């Protein structure tokens, strides 16, 4: 079988982009079992309740991510919501650890994707948005959409 190349998106965490202001993005590998990878190849995953923690040993973990059991799996299947280790360089982990010490900052998973046949997680150092920030972002998005619609309508009339 030929080796995979390129990127293929599995799942995005749209709620994280809405609830947090993204500061820095990182790409992290994931330590997974075989049935987890097979389930991800079918596009079955959810990051809606996922969060990232750093333990005392300086290891990063993806927790709360739901990767359902592989349908054709046997007794060797995985637990859907188990902790999964994130693979990053030591310097990146220490930089992120220093970042979350600041008030209001956290690390959130943004997406899972395949890159050259390996599962990667896009994670970000993020600051929580206040309610008015969320409304402001929605308003700006809506204004942009209306402006595009008006320009399209004006172009059609000529």
Curated annotation (Swiss-Prot):
Belongs to the SmpB family. GO terms for cellular component: cytosol. NCBIfam families: PRK05422.1, smpB. It holds the Pfam family SmpB. GO terms for molecular function: RNA binding. It is found in: Cytoplasm. This is SsrA-binding protein. InterPro entries: SmpB (IPR023620), SsrA-bd_prot (IPR000037), SsrA-bd_prot_CS (IPR020081). The gene is smpB. It comes from the Bacteria. Required for rescue of stalled ribosomes mediated by trans-translation. Binds to transfer-messenger RNA (tmRNA), required for stable association of tmRNA with ribosomes. tmRNA and SmpB together mimic tRNA shape, replacing the anticodon stem-loop with SmpB. tmRNA is encoded by the ssrA gene; the 2 termini fold to resemble tRNA(Ala) and it encodes a 'tag peptide', a short internal open reading frame. During trans-translation Ala-aminoacylated tmRNA acts like a tRNA, entering the A-site of stalled ribosomes, displacing the stalled mRNA. Keywords: Cytoplasm, RNA-binding. One of its GO terms (biological process) is trans-translation.
């Amino acid at each position: 079988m030929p080796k995979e190349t390129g990127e293929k998106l599995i799942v995005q965490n749209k709620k994280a982009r809405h609830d947090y202001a993204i500061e820095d993005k990182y790409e992290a590998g994931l330590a997974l079992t075989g049935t987890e990878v097979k389930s991800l190849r079918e596009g079955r995953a959810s990051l809606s309740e996922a969060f990232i923690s750093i333990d005392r040993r300086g290891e990063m973990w993806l927790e709360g991510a739901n990767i359902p059991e592989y349908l054709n799996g046997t007794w060797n299947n995985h637990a859907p919501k188990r902790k999964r280790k994130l693979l990053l360089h030591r310097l990146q982990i220490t930089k992120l650890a220093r970042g979350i010490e600041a008030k209001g900052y956290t690390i959130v998973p943004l997406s899972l994707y395949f890159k050259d046949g390996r599962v990667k997680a896009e994670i970000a150092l993020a600051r929580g948005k206040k309610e008015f920030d969320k409304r402001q972002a929605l308003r700006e998005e809506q204004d942009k959409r209306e402006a595009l619609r008006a320009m399209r309508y004006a172009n059609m009339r000529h």
